[in-house]
């Protein structure tokens, strides 16, 4: 892809915000691993997911020098930089022990496993996500003609389970719901039991 894009003078911006939240010991590849990718690509990552700094608005970009310089210039028009204590916290996280990253990854992987297994017992087969703190789950056959919004509403009213309807993410999200892996395993199991009320 990178070689082809050079021919057409196209740049690639890669969002790798969930780079460290991967499962089954299979980290996602970086576009910058591709030969000559730095000639056309910039990769962004966020401290939000890896270090639980959501809302702190801090991350970094690496890649094509000219694009990074342009990004720096544009950013200077938008703000004056991140609050100093946030920068110090981010530097401390990056330079400190990374055991917390492994721990967070392990917690999300365990929650993912519980979600997939317990929902399957409740009649809803969810493919096992390979990464991130979300499961992108196909809506059951019973709801395919009714849509993701109806399914999400029924989950809320009949099972007391909150999910995001796929349609909220655009037309290609229809047919799916997004489930956050942010609750503990006991709550995930309880949610799966409640899903049985829908008789999927």
Regions found by a protein language model. Give the residues of each.
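PLP-dependent class I/II
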Residues: 4-200
């Amino acid at each position: 892809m990178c070689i082809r894009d050079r021919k057409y003078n196209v740049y690639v911006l890669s969002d790798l915000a969930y780079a460290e939240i991967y499962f089954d010991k299979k980290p996602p590849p970086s576009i910058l691993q591709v030969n000559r990718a730095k000639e056309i690509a910039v990769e962004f990552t966020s401290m939000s997911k890896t270090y639980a700094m959501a809302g702190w608005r801090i991350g970094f970009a690496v890649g094509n020098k000219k694009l990074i310089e342009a990004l720096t210039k544009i950013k200077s028009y938008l703000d004056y930089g991140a609050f100093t204590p946030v920068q110090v916290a981010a530097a401390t996280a990056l330079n400190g022990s990374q055991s917390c990253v492994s721990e967070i990854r392990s917690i999300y992987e365990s929650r993912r496993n519980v979600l997939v297994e317990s929902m399957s017992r409740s009649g809803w087969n969810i493919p096992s996500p390979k990464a991130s703190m979300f499961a992108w789950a196909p809506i059951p056959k019973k709801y395919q003609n009714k849509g993701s919004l109806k399914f999400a509403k029924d989950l809320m009213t009949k099972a007391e389970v909150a999910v995001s309807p796929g349609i909220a993410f655009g037309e290609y999200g229809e047919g799916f719901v997004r489930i956050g892996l942010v609750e503990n395993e006991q709550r995930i199991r309880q949610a799966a039991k409640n899903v049985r009320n829908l008789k999927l």
